[in-house]
Amino acid sequence: TVNNGNIQENATEQTTDHAGAIIGFKTQRGEQVHARIASYFISFEQAARNMKELGNDNLEQIKQKGQKAWNQVLGKIEVEGGNLDQYRTFYSCLYRSLLFPRKFYELDEAGKPVHYSPYNGQVLPGYMFTDTGFWDTFRCLFPLLNLMYPSMNKEMQEGLINTYKESGFFPEWASPGHRDCMIGNNSASVLADAYLKGIKVEDVKTLYEGLIHGTKNVHPTVSSTGRRGYEYYNKLGYVPYDVKINENTARTLEYAYNDWCIYQLAKE
């Protein structure tokens, strides 16, 4: 095994921030090795359940199923009128657009979603997604998901509500928990846009509560979550340049748009 970059011989387990494993097989020339590996965030038992997803398929069969699944996802959009290189560019970009947010939940023995929370360290029911920053993705990616992949985006919206319940804030950049980077309160745009386009989450009261909470609070340790400078913005309508808060103009513009999104949701 590997502990923070250091190989530990004859050790089969590690408890550390950065762990790894090295596995070797004694083979003869031309011999093929097929190994099955399962990962988990919850327990060894969950890893065994995750392994069942592979069934008895070999690598080639899994590859073919993966190609079929991606063709179904990418095939929701058909383009015409261009050349082969343009088609390749379009679908390559669409593929990359759909890699994130990343699923951060697993299925329990009853087939129900369950997740390890990066926010409070508990194993809880429901969806969870990570590895996305709304400062970038609220502009184009999530509007695309609303239109073309609404069922998947509904799971993402439920996951956002779980994040609020587990941490007290909607995420602005999840990786896997709250990450301190970028500006804005653009979870408001992501949540309001989805709801107004017909992706109705069950707990809309909690959704709205969380949005309002984010307009007048900032995370105690991750200042990019919530609204840094909300005291000035809520009183003056802008974040001044001389209050030792960076990106003043950008924050003001983002917060104003975020407020408009919350207003549209409130009217609904």
Model-predicted regions and their roles:
Residues T1-F129, F169-E172, V201, K205, ...:
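Acidic/polar, glycine-enriched structural segments that form the non-catalytic walls/loops
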Residues T1-V33, Y40-F44, M51, M152, ...:
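Active-site cavity-forming subdomains of large catalytic enzyme subunits
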Residues S92-E106, T130-N153, A192-K197, W260-E268:
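Alpha-helical support elements that line or immediately flank enzyme active sites
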